[in-house]
Regions:
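Membrane-interfacial helix-loop segments of redox and metal-homeostasis proteins
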Residues: 1-211
């Protein structure tokens, strides 16, 4: 029901389903940390030409142009998929948040991984800060509703699948070198490996939503 960022946002809104999913995420990251400790590695990154690193950003720009200047791409007319901020506000907000996330090296899986392997809580502190800020916002605006049926949040209480789904995300994130947010940031920095990972996430999400 969402990436680790979405999970934390749901947690801050009082959604107990997200807290259940956190169990799976921590266990998945722990399993990945165990694999790293026992020698798992995808090898060292190597510099390539700049053109390969620009493929995904150019592709994303093309999708943005198609979404705003044509009717080729379909958009949801009802349900949660139809709710979004104005395009300009989304771009400005995304640029600000993306810059802060890049500078702080924000990574949800990395924070737990570093805490387990190196007893380093720097990245985890950033995640905790985000949670506290959003918790205060939700409390101040009356959006905080504690329970398994939080208004405005599309969720289910099938706890086994919540745990297993986020376990897979946590495990894969550690092996790939970063959570979905971190992969998106690295792809924007020019990482071809992360670009392939992001494309894989898009493809898998499309399969899950359409079949």
């Amino acid at each position: 029901l969402g990436c680790p960022l979405r999970m934390v946002l749901r947690m801050s809104a009082g959604d107990l389903n997200a807290w259940v999913a956190l169990i799976g995420f921590v266990l998945g990251v722990g399993t990945g940390a165990f694999a790293l400790k026992n020698g798992f590695s995808l090898g060292r990154a190597h510099e390539t030409n700049k053109e390969s690193g620009a493929v995904l950003p150019v592709l994303m720009l093309g999708i943005l142009i198609l979404a705003t200047c044509s009717t080729l791409l379909k958009a949801s007319e009802a349900g949660p998929g139809s709710f979004h901020a104005p395009i300009i506000m989304s771009l400005i907000g995304g640029l600000i948040f993306g810059a802060l996330a890049q500078k702080s090296r924000m990574c949800f899986a990395g924070g737990i991984r570093d805490a387990i392997l190196m007893k380093n809580f720097d990245l985890l502190t950033i995640i905790a800060g985000l949670f506290v800020v959003m918790l205060i916002f939700n409390l101040a605006t009356g959006r905080f509703v504690l329970g398994f049926n939080t208004p405005g949040i599309i969720a289910h209480s099938n706890h086994l699948w919540n745990i297993l789904g986020m376990y897979a995300v946590g495990f894969a994130a550690v092996l790939a070198g970063g959570c979905p947010l971190r992969q998106l940031i690295l792809a924007g920095q020019g990482s071809s490996d992360s670009a392939v990972t992001v494309l894989g996430m898009f493809f898998a999400a499309a399969l899950c939503h359409n079949f």
